[in-house]
Amino acid sequence: MRILCLDIGNSRVGVAISDPLKITAQPVMTIELRNKDLFEELDKIFQGYNIEKVVIGYPLSKLHPDQKDEKLKKIDEISEKIGSRYNVEIVKWDERFSTKAVERVIDEELNWKRKKKIIDKVAAVYILQGYLDFYNGS
């Protein structure tokens, strides 16, 4: 059984998956939302892997706890659909600063277009690895 991670953005979704022992996270893909349907792509992923849980990168807001911005509402809506469609546990994991941390690590030599594709899936790896480390008590 594996854990899938999604880093949901406005135009792209970074996807990462754990190894079967749930120790390490690997990048899977970046889904370009303007060109592809998120759930068609997720259907393929769920068919290819035995997934028991989905970790969703959740940008904990600086707003009052009772307030949610549009991005959080979108993530909540997608999370609910994923949970019911695939009958999996959903875990929302703090992803604040994950993209910024990954941007610092990625080689500055990459052109911006290539960098954007890599950043999203590597951000998903960063989020999932943080969750796996917590999950495994590391």
UniProtKB/Swiss-Prot annotation:
Top enzyme category: hydrolase
Pfam family, one: RuvX
Cell compartments where the protein resides: Cytoplasm
S-S bridge residues: none
BP-aspect Gene Ontology terms: rRNA 5'-end processing
Similarity section: Belongs to the YqgF nuclease family.
Record's protein name: Putative pre-16S rRNA nuclease
Higher taxonomy: Bacteria, Bacillati, Bacillota, Bacillota incertae sedis, Caldicellulosiruptorales
